[in-house]
């Protein structure tokens, strides 16, 4: 799932290109990121839920209390986005991402 970057009342700064891999588990998401790296495409995960951070755990926050945050986190993949990407780079990223997601999810 790719969220739109523009709408009637908003426009993205295009700082990050975040996708969600519907139906992917935490482990499958990790496998997708690893396979993309093997193809030369560096992906990442942004916005780790606060209850997963040690400081918040030490204050008593528990991930179980925030199921929606975890659900978004577990299958989120951030694709490369920067001003030096050529059209060919974008095509390469998209093609490989689609192939890898299909390979991992079957």
Predicted regions and their residues:
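PLP-dependent aminotransferase class I/II
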Residues: 1-106
